[in-house]
Amino acid sequence: MLGLEKPLSSDISSSSTDTSAISPISVSSMPLSPDKEKKKIKFIRYNPDIPQIVTSFKGYQKLMYQGYRYNIYQVVPEKNFKSWRCVCAKKMPDDGQWCKCRAETTSDNSNACTKNTHNHPPKHRVAEIEFIKSQLINAAFENPDHDAGDLINQACMYLSEGVSFDNKESLKKSLVSARNKEGKPRKPKSKTSTNPLKRMKIEIEEEDENVFKMQRMDNDITGFLPLLNNSISMVKVESPFSTTPTIQIPPPNPPQIHQPQEHSNLLQPAALNGFNNSWMGGIEDPIAMFWANAMLNPSGLDVLSTIAALSKHQLHSQGPTQAATAPAAPLSSNLSVSSFTPQMPKEASMAIPPTQILNLKDLKPLPPLAAIQTSPVIQAASLLRPIPMKNDMGTQTVEEIKVSRCLTSGCGCRVIRICCCDEGRCRRAAAC
């Protein structure tokens, strides 16, 4: 049987685990370990009279001098020369003019001097903040294990009175991002493609198995072919032409070339639909014959051939013509039965009288204007000028109504007076 041993008694006052040693007050007063002790970072205060070189987050160098900021413009190592250009050279300032001021330094960024003058006031606050930010970036790279927030708090102690960072949280994120990207190669910027088909790419999710799979569309137009083939294969088409008889469409008739007709046929009675028009045999005048043929067959009208036929007929009107003995030839053989065939009335068989030409010598001169005005016809027409009648509109007084009563007793009619004066002119006053 095992026995329990009594623990040895010890003096608490002489023990190293004294209650005062583990009290909260003593813990807070204990010095921190060297690895947890806050490291002091030394920054340089901003001095506008000393040219300072800063490095931005993107790695570009800037010159801060007398409250103005300059971008690197030209570097000539052979001549120990650097040229700087004001940041307002491309950025429009408040006055609306570009700054043409330049600064020059040696290769070690000393002995700064300016050329020309600035057209805008200096901005010391912006220059100081950029100068301290540049030191923050270097401190974050040199001390990667140091807290970024503590670095910002230490940098704020070196700012001038009234100057502070706009957003400390955003600055902290920038420092952390710069630390993570250190030592990593930059990703090359991909050039934006100008092909509009690139925006139309369709990606099919693998989870949905019911959706038919389709190849991804390339930049070529051939990417549309899989979609077209799949959509056509999903449709079942039954041909209805297996039982339907084929219909043969006859080819169209070729256009027939109009053959020139003889001049004499235009002045002969034409055969309409294979029948001779016996009533046109009595027409002897060539002009009447021409109009009769034109009414029966308008498509066979040829102006040039008609003029030539009429002129030839006038030259040989005295002797017998060959056209009188020639058989009647149809003007057009293309005239169908369904075409419009007007019937020629009997009055059309009469010869149309020739047009008379007026001779200027036969015209008589007009009489003079004085003789026309004194003509009895003109004077009689002026006397018959209508006179406007003015009716009684019911504005007469009681006495005027009594005067205008009818002379016959018991009659209810009234006498209507008519004024023969013109508007605005009294004839009686003119006669007086």
Curated annotation (Swiss-Prot):
Low complexity bias spans: 9-26
The entry's keywords: Developmental protein, DNA-binding, Metal-binding, Nucleus, Transcription, Transcription regulation, Zinc, Zinc-finger
Zinc finger (FLYWCH-type): 53-120
Disulfide bonds: none
Entry keyword Zinc-finger: yes
Task of the protein: Putative transcription factor. Binds to specific sequence motif 5'-[TC][AGT]TGCC[GA][AT]-3' in regulatory elements of target genes such as myosin myo-2. May modulate gene expression, perhaps acting in opposition to transcription factor pha-4. Involved in morphogenesis, perhaps especially in formation of the pharynx. Plays roles in molting, feeding and morphology.
One matching Pfam family: FLYWCH
InterPro entries (alphabetical): Znf_FLYWCH
GO molecular function, one term: zinc ion binding
Protein's recorded name: FLYWCH-type zinc finger-containing protein peb-1
Gene: peb-1
Subcellular location: Nucleus
UniProt keyword annotation of DNA-binding present: yes
Recorded superkingdom: Eukaryota
